Curated annotation (Swiss-Prot):
Keywords: Antibiotic biosynthesis, Magnesium, Metal-binding, Transferase. Its cofactor is Mg(2+). Activates the five peptidyl carrier protein (PCP) domains of gramicidin synthase GrsAB, by transferring the 4'-phosphopantetheinyl moiety of coenzyme A (CoA) to a serine residue. Required for gramicidin S production. One of its GO terms (biological process) is fatty acid biosynthetic process. Gene3D superfamilies: 4'-phosphopantetheinyl transferase domain (3.90.470.20). It catalyses: apo-[peptidyl-carrier protein] + CoA = holo-[peptidyl-carrier protein] + adenosine 3',5'-bisphosphate + H(+). One of its GO terms (cellular component) is cytosol. This is 4'-phosphopantetheinyl transferase gsp. Belongs to the P-Pant transferase superfamily. Gsp/Sfp/HetI/AcpT family. GO terms for molecular function: holo-[acyl-carrier-protein] synthase activity; magnesium ion binding. Mg(2+) binds at D106, E108, E150. It comes from Aneurinibacillus migulanus (Bacillus migulanus).
Length: 237
């Protein structure tokens, strides 16, 4: 099972709404918001955590005050429940993936880059595949590979401790395959076409994932959820 949730980042969130939503996340996260130079970075960080909290509250029936985020030795967040999650954001979109197996997700806005950097950072087999693409699709293909590689690294949970060229993506088969030390990795890769101008990939460290659910949310829905939760707490006689 993989549940994907995504929300569009508004150009502006009313200050009172932002403060209310912020009150539903950890003090550590709240303190981090004031350090952001770009307010939209704070929006992205807030919305990412709220997506996870929404799932835990509504699906697992966990009270918001009982949700505590921790980090492993490599900095990947986790919770003390039988669930795995990962968050990514790029420009105007925030996405998260939730699963009963380790999972990673990455979204990137397609932007102009020098394709030659792929030769430096990618595995040689990936660079050969990239060079085989039509010139007008190479940039899009670059971000296709990049998001798959990022989602795999994030699923493992070791961040950049895993060299990005220590494994390679085989796009020449009916399904996307990852090889590490010439051995096929037991993973499942999804590449949902969510939004024009973006690439998104999701990786599960389980080879037989068959159930994928994708849900688009509005900021107002998150507001309503936490308003309802607050009202219930204040009227719990």
């Amino acid at each position: 099972m993989i549940e994907m949730l995504f929300v569009k980042v508004p150009n502006e969130i009313d200050r009172h709404v932002f403060n209310f939503l912020s009150s539903n996340v950890s003090k550590e996260k709240q303190q981090a918001f004031v350090r952001y130079v770009n307010v939209k970075d704070a929006y992205r960080s807030l919305l990412g955590e709220l997506l996870i909290r929404k799932y835990l509250i509504q699906v697992l029936n966990i009270p918001n005050e009982n949700i505590l985020f921790r980090k492993n030795e490599y900095g990947k967040p986790f919770v003390d429940f039988d669930i795995h999650f990962n968050i990514s954001h790029s420009d105007e979109w925030v996405v998260c993936a939730i699963s009963n197996h380790p999972v990673g997700i990455d979204i990137e806005r397609i932007s102009e880059i020098d394709i030659k950097i792929a030769e430096q950072f990618f595995h040689e087999n990936e660079y050969i595949w990239l060079q085989s693409k039509a010139q007008n699709s190479q940039v899009s293909s670059f971000f296709e590979l990049w998001t798959i590689k990022e989602s795999y690294i994030k699923a493992i949970g070791k961040g950049m401790y895993i060299p990005i060229n220590s494994f390679w993506i085989d796009k020449n088969q009916t399904q996307t395959v990852i090889y590490k030390q010439n051995k096929k990795e037991p993973v499942t890769i999804y590449e949902p076409e969510l939004f024009e101008g973006y690439k998104c990939s999701c990786c599960s460290l389980f080879s037989s994932v068959t159930n994928l659910s994708i849900t688009k949310l509005q900021v107002q829905e998150l507001c309503n959820l936490f308003l309802d939760s607050t009202f219930s707490e204040n009227n719990n006689f």
